[in-house]
Amino acid sequence: MSNNLYDDSIRMLWASKLVYSFAKLLQEGRAGGLDLADTFPPEVLAAYKDERLDVRDLGEGNGLSFNAVLKIVVANAENLKKIEPEFEYVAKMIEKIQAVENADESSDELFLETFSSIDAATQCVYGVLKDTKNKRVTVVFRGSTDFSTRDWQTNLSAQLEGMKTPKLLKDGLEGELKKRVLVHRGFYEYIFDNKRAKGDQRYDMILNDIKPFVEEGYKIYVTGHSLGAALASLLAFKLAGSDKSWIPKPITCISYASPFVGTDGFRTAFTLLEQMGHIRYLRVNNDADTVPTIPPFSLGWKKRLYKHVGINLRLYDDSFILSHPNSNGWGFVNAVRNSVLKPVWSVLTYHSLQTHEDRMDAQKERLQHMNLDDLYANEELFGTPKTSLCG
């Protein structure tokens, strides 16, 4: 059972933003652009130059406490001013987190376990967090770093890739969907088609990261912003459809400003997993953000149109709409209109996590009276795709 929509979502937002700042510090430090000797704990500094930061043995076996992570970010304020365009927002967010948590390291309940930036060329960065209070292990994907990297070339590409349909869905699907669903090739390759020299897939690495905590009774959460949201969607789908007995269901995914991930066949399979109770997905986006409308389509006919999945929390300045998607073609028309007509500045303004947080704060009281389990039990919302709930 989730706590409430606001608390669950805002913590995922904070994690998504902090993974940006933490990654920037590590990458600049590795490249020699920053001296981190005075701002990182010695035991962390000893490991940070590796592609993979494993801190599970710190904190009496709990990992690097979230408060310790915050202290690292705060200690690097001057460094972050040089490399973090939204430094003022990060500083305000940290103050807010510290006020909400109102705890020192001795009472910490959230810990960073591993942090991986496997390939500098593709910028696939993720962290694994352990929440001892709520018994959750969360995979946090970092999103696109700026509008000129390969990350955004991947976001804007429209090629499709066949992803194997989970075995447990085959009896409920027809035709080609029994074999595969079509998803965004670039997003797929980040996680599932990237064998390194040792033959490891990032997906396998993530499984190895989370399995010890799942075996201790932890539930699995996934989150990310922008590109990170797309990766979170695919990982959640893969985990929810897995026949591995140790993976608990449902998988919970809360994403921010996700671009399209798959076609209508992917949506059909995803919705079936929702109906089976294997996945719970809240896809949060700002009205007027262009990124959730790209890429609107690949080459081909209607079955090549991209479709969104999950319950959508669409945020406005003074309201919100909760809806579940459908396949009636309206999404395509709306996506093309939005992506063509909206100016570039709207991406910068409305794509920011700061705008997401401001709008969620404006609706905090209403969102705190909802939770994701109840939304999925609401037949008006989930059972009848064309309906929506407004706030």
What are these regions (language model features)?
Residues M1-T223, L227-G391:
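Non-catalytic, mobile gating and regulatory segments of ester bond hydrolases
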